[in-house]
Amino acid sequence: MRGFTYLSKVLHSHSSYSKLLVLCSVSTGGLLVYAESNVESGKQVVEQNQPESKKKRVVVLGTGWGGTSFLKDVDISSYDVQVVSPRNYFAFTPLLPSVTCGTVEARSIVEPVRNIIKKRSGEIQFWEAECLKIDPENRTVSCRSGINDNLAGQNDFSLQYDYLVVAVGAQVNTFNTPGVMEHCHFLKEVEDAQRIRRTVIDCFEKSVIPGLSEEERRTNLHFVIVGGGPTGVEFAAELHDYVYEDLVKIYPSVKDFVKITVIQSGDHILNTFDERISSFAEQKFQRDGIEVSTGCRVTSVSDHFINMKVKSTGKHVEVPYGMVVWSTGVGTRPFVKDFMEQVGQEKRRILATDEWLRVKGCSNVYALGDCASIDQRKVMEDISAIFKAADKDDSGTLSIEEFRDVLEDIIIRYPQVDLYLKNKHLLEAKDLFRDSEGNEREEVDIEGFKLALSHVDSQMKSLPATAQVAAQQGTYLSRCLNRWDQCKSNPEGPRHFKSSGRHEFLPFEYRHLGQFAPLGGDQAAAELPGDWVSMGHSTQWLWYSVYASKQVSWRTRYLVVGDWVRRYIFGRDSSRI
């Protein structure tokens, strides 16, 4: 006993010895478990890790793309950072469709949050809990832990903040369609992908039970995907490969009964992509036997049937199914809706921010990713102030030189101006001043200036709800906070047109780096900057390299690539676990 006590003290003082001892024990076939538990000392550690500090407290809600990218770059020597999330990991969500069919394992695409924050040279507090309410007036968030339910009254807690970062993503939007919540699968979380994987196997197992009619087998093996966006299309492609590369080999008696259908309310699938990609995807799905029903809207879902309306004819169709995956629309989480009501945004569908990601209607609260949308200010709302600021000599007219002097600030503050100039192929400021007949003008009055910019706001577009947008926003916000004091004294943003001075920071600017659409059969489509489109087998290898490089850690990168190799050699696993 004394020997164990001495050994315990040595291992506690020299952690490297304990690691070496564990390694040696495992390598020789033994198993050593060394642990020290002291509740009281644990409480003291928590107290010591939370000293009174003059650092501003930043509370981050969410560990998705926006929250994680913010945590990786924020200066924790300047801020007391605390993170609240109901999941203690980051998930590489673009690979969720691959998880549904076993191409990639679930644990290969997740990285524990504590692994991410421990790499920072400082301390970030993480609380595995769900946010229940935001109180912007008192600058507090109310949270509830989903663990330790036996500790009555100790699951709820609140945190005060100086700055709040809301990066909680979105939940599924059913558009109040009857039966969707009860009968459909979703694909937003890792758990969703795992449930889909089990259900696919269940459908096949049910279909080989003796005594079933052909109609019953066809119904069980009819897989329906509602939504023809990137998630729905990629899942349909993954499922097709899983079925025809793996499952038909072990369920050969029912291979002729399998059917995959994609229901899309729009005229084409992948309608946010280039038309060439959309057309290529539809043609490939047709060759693969995947049915694409465009121009159809689902009106209700029962336990065995989907009811949909064909827009062109107005006819209602009843479709039997074995499994439905709902992959369309994003909705707002309940506590975010409550927060929106508090800040006067109750009529909006999604949380509104300005171009600096600040939530409108309150101070010191920022929102990133799918839970928010940038409410870009319109040029025509400030047209008089812009004209007055540009008219330096107060002549009542604006010369080309005066306009050119403020054009850079206008483009930064109102990015739709730059889009308008490019789309209209207007190379210089003077091109905006041309009259209706195309003649050049040296100067314009306020009415002429309004006419010149009257169509600019038509170029405004909402940012897509993608991981790429959220990640860039998280990085942008962290860099703004890191340079807060510097930019307060030396502003680097565009000029204030309605007042004097400049904005402290440049507004957020999204840089589209391209998007992929895996289409199955080791083929993919890519849309990259510069109107460059690529489709086929070579694009699939580009997809592999990009997605491997974008993994959050070397551990997940190794696991994901290993899963791809395993699938090529051994195929996908069909076990129901």
From Swiss-Prot:
- Positions annotated to bind FAD: 57-87
Name where it's found: Mitochondrion inner membrane; Peroxisome
Quote the record's activity regulation. Activity is calcium-dependent with a more pronounced effect at higher pH.
Give the cofactors, semicolon-separated. FAD
An example Gene Ontology CC term for this record: peroxisome
* EC id: 1.6.5.9
Keywords attached to this entry: Calcium, FAD, Flavoprotein, Membrane, Metal-binding, Mitochondrion, Mitochondrion inner membrane, NAD, NADP, Oxidoreductase, Peroxisome, Transit peptide
- Transit peptide residues are 1-35
Binding sites annotated in the UniProt record for NAD(+): 221-257
Catalytic activity annotated for this protein? a quinone + NADH + H(+) = a quinol + NAD(+); a ubiquinone + NADH + H(+) = a ubiquinol + NAD(+)
Listed SUPFAM superfamilies: EF-hand, FAD/NAD(P)-binding domain
Where along this sequence does the record place binding of Ca(2+)? Answer: 391, 393, 395, 397, 402
Enumerate the InterPro entries for this protein: EF-hand-dom_pair (IPR011992), EF_Hand_1_Ca_BS (IPR018247), EF_hand_dom (IPR002048), FAD/NAD-bd_sf (IPR036188), FAD/NAD-binding_dom (IPR023753), NDH-2 (IPR045024), NDH2-like_C (IPR054585)
Taking every annotated instance into account, which residue ranges of this chain make up the domain EF-hand? 378-413
GO MF terms, alphabetically ordered: calcium ion binding; NADH:ubiquinone reductase (non-electrogenic) activity; oxidoreductase activity
Motif segment (Microbody targeting signal):
568-577
Q: What does this protein do?
A: Alternative NADH-ubiquinone oxidoreductase which catalyzes the oxidation of mitochondrial NADH does not translocate protons across the inner mitochondrial membrane. Calcium-dependent NAD(P)H dehydrogenase. Binds calcium ions.
Q: What is this protein called in UniProt?
A: External alternative NAD(P)H-ubiquinone oxidoreductase B1, mitochondrial
The gene it comes from is NDB1
